[in-house]
């Protein structure tokens, strides 16, 4: 359900700056590869995956759909994914996949959760 919050260019830029202020020391500008499994029409994916990593000169690997979760295996197999953002459902599904849990991607530096507290 939409919360009716007005998004302005200034709001978006402030959000990008907030994200960078928290993670700047962990982002290797121009070298990161972020997996975008959430749709960009959600503000979290739009600001974090697209705007933040675009600003950092990084690559976005777009997953057309994370369902079934095996769709993401190809992205992890073919790209050196360094960051992934998601929601509880996505992370729970990944951790229940044998290919992910048995051999986690060596290049993955960080996972960031949005939408609710990570469980």
Protein language model regions, located:
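Short acidic-hydrophobic sequence patches enriched in Asp/Glu that either
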Residues: 7-11, 68, 86
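Conserved AMP-binding/adenylation subdomain of ANL enzymes
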Residues: 13-33, 43-82, 93, 97
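Conserved G/P- and acidic residue-centered "switch" motifs that form tight phosphate/ATP-binding loops
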Residues: 1, 57, 115
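Short, flexible micro-motifs
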Residues: 7, 48, 60, 116-118
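Short acidic capping loops at alpha-helix termini that bridge into adjacent secondary structure
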Residues: 3, 29-33, 106-108
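Conserved AMP-binding A3 loop
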Residues: 1-17
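Conserved S/T- and glycine-rich ATP-binding loop of Class I adenylate-forming
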Residues: 1, 12, 34, 40, ...
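Adenylate-forming
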Residues: 38, 65, 81-119
């Amino acid at each position: 359900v939409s919360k009716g919050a007005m998004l302005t260019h200034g709001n978006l830029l402030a959000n990008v700056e907030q994200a960078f202020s928290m993670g700047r020391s962990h982002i290797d500008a121009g070298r990161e590869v972020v997996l975008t499994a959430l749709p960009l029409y959600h503000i979290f994916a739009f600001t974090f995956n697209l705007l933040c990593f675009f600003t950092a000169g990084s690559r976005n690997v777009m997953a057309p759909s994370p369902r079934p979760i095996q769709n993401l295996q190809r992205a992890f197999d073919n790209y050196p994914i360094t960051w992934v953002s998601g929601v509880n459902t996505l992370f729970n599904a990944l951790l229940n996949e044998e290919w992910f849990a048995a051999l986690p991607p060596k290049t993955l530096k960080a996972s960031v959760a949005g939408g609710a507290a990570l469980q």
